[in-house]
Amino acid sequence: TTLVEKSNVQQKVFDNTFAVFEELKEALHEMTSEINDALEEQIDKRIRIEYRDRGKFEAQLQVAGDVLIFSMHTNVFEFNREHIIWQNSYVRDEKLNSYCGIINIYNFLSDSLKYNRNAEEGYLVGRIFINREMQYFVEGKRQMSMRHNNFGQGVIDKSALIDIVEHAINYALEFDLLVPPYEI
């Protein structure tokens, strides 16, 4: 692999990831309206879903007491040699397919952000990996749609993004706070 080839691949990966992130933000905005319209008469107005565009590389989706933060990393990554992705022939047969951009999905308590409780950590609930050919896979909590073994078998599109977001929302809603142990 030459410097020029590797640089071109990494730039293509960045461009693809950025395009997917823009599509993700559009999907989040549309989903917010659709869900709020569907639930308008059923839920308290204080727990409506709210979408916030936080700039080129971040978007937020508030769902009840949780905030899902979608964050596009501005760097391109390759997987370490121990990562399970190297068992996939799509990557093994063409090393350049292993370079991926990442969109991280975090879950925070909305009050942690609202009241600047910076000591309260969020949870990484998912990562979307996108390569030069718009092939993708997802690592994450209950993300079953496109696992590493399917990498190279599907181009990411709006339908896939909606599925990923729905899984992240469901995970956030099912994740209950646990009382920390009390030590005497």
What does each model-identified segment do?
Residues T2-I49:
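Contiguous, amphipathic alpha-helical segments that mediate oligomerization or scaffolding
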